[in-house]
């Protein structure tokens, strides 16, 4: 019998833990955040979250559901009926393709939708090729389900560009899926319709799945929605689309998203839902239903706020000597920029925090290609962005 774990002998507390869990780590801005609390008066632009409180029409719908006694399990593991119907209509209208109820499953957050997509496909010994720079949760989630995370970086020459031939060459016989975020967190890079068509054709030829993270799809500035794989894929294609209410409807704390999948795997997705989380809270789903049915003005307001923030950021940062500003992104909620001569932005972020009281996310979080970059969330009230940029200008000039 192995020795019992104890405070005096904690090593044995880790016996038997799965390697993927034992080795799991999260990259964060924790040290900067701790310092920010010590400094006070810090404008936090490092998180991927706006400052808008969820509007009353969504909150009231959730409250009404609670008041009506909606405190029980939702028996359909794919979601609350009115929300399923609303999502089917919404996606069909938005993408110009029939996307029926059978193709959508509601999840407690976009991260859960992503995790279910990976659990559906990834075995130990297989890999997922993902487009980088990328939100660090993606790398860790692939690792957590037992797969090999295989980053493939966008090229940067003043603009972020995807080398499709290189991406396809990075795949091999063990590749289960290609993962991309479009618009991207952190770069704002957005796949074109032509790139989506090439990805879909590659999937049809090879059997490799496409997982498209479209959480920022409505935060696109050239059209009501960014180019989507759902606009061209058939129900029988090996395509999964991850989405969330967090960004476009100001609902980050509600933890609700959805996965769009082929009808043929609906049974497996429903079973996974039952075993992993037993469904999403009914009152939260009621709020999300209101967001879908009544929320277009809200989406447009958030989009305008981001465009204003980006315009302000680019106008101010261009005045700071040595700033490297990529082509202004067409989507997302971030300005992603670098400082000439700085190979690692962590020192720059710490310096800006100390001297300007502005919190930015260092690029190393998003992969080695992004080490020199800083991420600024611009989905904030105009005055807050102006104050932050004013402090940075005063510091750097």
Region spans (language model):
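PLP-dependent enzyme catalytic core of the Aspartate aminotransferase-like
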Residues: 2-4, 89, 168, 342-343, ...
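Conserved glycine-rich beta-strand-loop-beta hairpin in the small C-terminal domain of fold type I
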Residues: 289, 305-314, 325-338
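Conserved core segment of the aminotransferase class I/II
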Residues: 2-7, 232, 237-307, 314-316, ...
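N-terminal small-domain helix-loop-helix segment of the aminotransferase-like
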Residues: 2-13, 18-109, 116, 292-294, ...
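A short helix->loop->beta-strand "cap" motif at the edges of active sites that frequently abuts
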Residues: 126, 147, 205-208, 237
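Helix C-cap/helix->beta junction micro-motif
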Residues: 39, 145, 205-206, 356
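Conserved PLP-anchoring active-site segment centered on the Schiff-base-forming lysine
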Residues: 103, 120-142
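Active-site phosphate-binding strand-loop segment of PLP-dependent enzymes
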Residues: 150, 154-222
């Amino acid at each position: 019998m192995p020795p019992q774990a104890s405070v005096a002998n904690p090593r044995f507390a880790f016996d038997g833990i799965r390697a993927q869990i034992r080795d799991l780590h999260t990259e964060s801005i924790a040290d900067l955040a701790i310092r920010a609390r010590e400094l006070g008066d810090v404008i936090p632009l490092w998180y991927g979250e706006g400052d808008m409180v969820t509007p009353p029409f969504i909150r009231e719908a959730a409250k009404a559901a609670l008041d009506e006694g909606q405190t029980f399990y939702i028996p359909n593991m794919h979601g609350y009926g009115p929300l399923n119907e609303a999502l089917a209509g919404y996606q069909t209208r938005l993408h110009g393709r029939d996307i029926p109820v059978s193709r959508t499953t509601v999840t407690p957050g976009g991260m859960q939708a992503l995790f279910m997509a990976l659990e559906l496909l990834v075995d130990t010994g297989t890999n997922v090729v993902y487009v980088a720079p990328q939100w660090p949760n993606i790398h860790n989630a692939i690792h957590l389900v037992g797969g090999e995370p295989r980053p493939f970086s966008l090229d940067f020459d003043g603009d972020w560009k995807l080398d499709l031939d290189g991406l396809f060459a990075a795949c091999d016989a063990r590749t289960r899926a290609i993962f991309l975020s479009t618009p991207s967190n952190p770069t704002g890079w957005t796949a074109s319709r032509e790139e989506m068509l090439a990805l879909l054709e590659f999937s049809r030829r090879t059997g490799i799945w496409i997982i498209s993270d479209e959480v920022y799809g409505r935060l696109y500035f050239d059209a009501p929605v960014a180019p989507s794989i759902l606009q061209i894929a058939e129900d029988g294609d090996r395509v999964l689309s991850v989405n969330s209410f967090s960004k476009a409807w100001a609902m980050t704390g509600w933890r609700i998203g959805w996965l769009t999948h082929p009808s043929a795997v609906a049974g497996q997705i429903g079973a996974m839902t039952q075993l992993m989380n037993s469904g999403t809270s009914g009152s939260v789903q009621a709020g999300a239903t209101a967001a879908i049915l009544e929320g277009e003005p809200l989406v447009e307001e958030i989009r305008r706020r981001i465009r204003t923030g980006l315009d302000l950021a680019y106008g101010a940062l261009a005045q700071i000597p040595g700033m490297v500003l990529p082509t202004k992104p067409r989507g997302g909620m971030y300005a992603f920029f670098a400082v000439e001569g700085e190979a690692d932005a962590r020192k720059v972020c710490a310096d800006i925090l100390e001297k300007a009281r502005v919190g930015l996310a260092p690029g190393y979080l998003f992969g080695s290609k992004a080490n020199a970059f800083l991420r600024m969330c611009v989905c904030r009230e105009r005055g807050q962005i102006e104050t932050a940029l004013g402090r940075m200008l005063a510091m750097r000039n």
